[in-house]
Amino acid sequence: MDFSKLPKILDEDKESTFGYVHGVSGPVVTACDMAGAAMYELVRVGHSELVGEIIRLEGDMATIQVYEETSGVSVGDPVLRTGKPLSVELGPGIMGAIFDGIQRPLSDISSQTQSIYIPRGVNVSALSRDIKWDFTPCKNLRVGSHITGGDIYGIVSENSLIKHKIMLPPRNRGTVTYIAPPGNYDTSDVVLELEFEGVKEKFTMVQVWPVRQVRPVTEKLPANHPLLTGQRVLDALFPCVQGGTTAIPGAFGCGKTVISQSLSKYSNSDVIIYVGCGERGNEMSEVLRDFPELTMEVDGKVESIMKRTALVANTSNMPVAAREASIYTGITLSEYFRDMGYHVSMMADSTSRWAEALREISGRLAEMPADSGYPAYLGARLASFYERAGRVKCLGNPEREGSVSIVGAVSPPGGDFSDPVTSATLGIVQVFWGLDKKLAQRKHFPSVNWLISYSKYMRALDEYYDKHFTEFVPLRTKAKEILQEEEDLAEIVQLVGKASLAETDKITLEVAKLIKDDFLQQNGYTPYDKFCPFYKTVGMLSNMIAFYDMARRAVETTAQSDNKITWSIIREHMGDILYKLSSMKFKDPLKDGEAKIKSDYAQLLEDMQNAFRSLED
């Protein structure tokens, strides 16, 4: 929001409007003489005018969580009420920007103050008022038209990837008395004027929305389109949908951040909101360094990924209270782009730090602690955040659909999934990508454990797969069966060794090894494997399962005859085929293209069939 427009303590004439600081405990300040204040109202605390939010009211005492460092605040300092809730500014200029937890633009603050830290009580507007945007009004809108909340009345080309649709705020309606002609305007210029019941109201390209309030929609729709991540293990075995909720719990060093970053780089979303909530500052600087260099191809043109990304950075050394706000800021920005009809992905890295901030503030308020010291309302807060995801029919005209998908990373201490934050999250989300420390230690990345992870969207996506990839669903079932069987056989192998297994079991073990090492494992730092399109995923899986079926059939049909085929014979004769199977992943989708990869995989299938025929003869 525009902090420069909030009232200042020096401008206030009457001292009776002030409250006064009564006590300070870290980020929590108590103030007296605050009768008439509202819950979640923004206040300015002390002579440095720190931004704070009221989180508890008792008589004329208010408890305030302050979003800045409170050293130097003393008892008796004035507290000024602003009469507004914590809100964000929504308008052109969000994409490619980096904000802190309460939507202060970090690059603007850095250029204005020449400091590497955010000074206290800094006043800047979230969206720059100096940049001119090229505004084009909608063709069918003229003076005298009636418009209502959510209607799109103009378009601004924010950059070559995002067409920013300018919408009427949800609660307004009326008859158009003025609409700006096409031209360049900044975000403080009036572009629309409405009249409703004799009252005229002017609108700029920016709307302000309270972060704790859900933006209204016409209706929620069932989600039925996959969120493709480019990671084979996730797309094939545990798919998520556009508008779904996902949790990625894992201990330190398991690759949570790499998965959430590759989601933001390569997923099929239109807009990415990346919230770094209480994680290391280096990770956010890595995102800032990598993303501008990363490109994607749109309609034959190469574009920077940063053009569709907004970052909310709230690293672990920033004030604790702002961590809680950063999650709400991120989800409100996501909902705004969803209302334009875009598919938005929001990455929250990590929700555990957010829960720890809740725990710290709850402890300072002397509330009753529940499990592990977290507050009793932890589950409710998590649910109210995750439930803002979904695929919806947007408010207003023209009719459009949008979605918000939330991917929350959870870092349980010591990788223990029975931790309260993880268990509360798993009760809410529909997809669980559990990361395994043992796999990470074996350098098997992405370290998603295929035995404990699950997705509840399988049924919802069956229709999509039947339409576009008919053979995929049985392949996935078969692959999961092979991996499960391999897990059961692993114990027997440890006891009696491989040699004493049945031939079919040996095949299961070898194919499971092939699937694990050459299908599920993926090197995110190579050009050919950093992103795997879905046709390549299906092609690879179908050849591996075809090999498994043919090998089993060859062994089973010749089991009774004299020249029976065993696994060792297959391996001897088919060294070349096995090598080709394990090197399917080296096909580069950008260099080779879809048609060549598909024909190569079809050729490999033909070679396999011929090899098994000659073996049986």
Curated annotation (Swiss-Prot):
Modification(s) after translation: Phosphorylation at Ser-384 by AMPK down-regulates its enzyme activity.
Keyword terms: ATP-binding, Cytoplasm, Cytoplasmic vesicle, Hydrogen ion transport, Ion transport, Lysosome, Membrane, Nucleotide-binding, Phosphoprotein, Translocase, Transport
Residue positions binding ATP: 250-257
SUPFAM superfamilies, alphabetized: C-terminal domain of alpha and beta subunits of F1 ATP synthase, N-terminal domain of alpha and beta subunits of F1 ATP synthase, P-loop containing nucleoside triphosphate hydrolases
Localisation: Cytoplasm; Cytoplasm, Cytosol; Cytoplasmic vesicle, Secretory vesicle; Cytoplasmic vesicle, Clathrin-coated vesicle membrane
Enzyme class: translocase
Keyword Secreted attributed: no
Description of how the protein assembles with itself and partners: V-ATPase is a heteromultimeric enzyme made up of two complexes: the ATP-hydrolytic V1 complex and the proton translocation V0 complex. The V1 complex consists of three catalytic AB heterodimers that form a heterohexamer, three peripheral stalks each consisting of EG heterodimers, one central rotor including subunits D and F, and the regulatory subunits C and H. The proton translocation complex V0 consists of the proton transport subunit a, a ring of proteolipid subunits c9c'', rotary subunit d, subunits e and f, and the accessory subunits ATP6AP1/Ac45 and ATP6AP2/PRR.
Record protein name field: V-type proton ATPase catalytic subunit A
Species this protein is from: Pongo abelii (Sumatran orangutan)
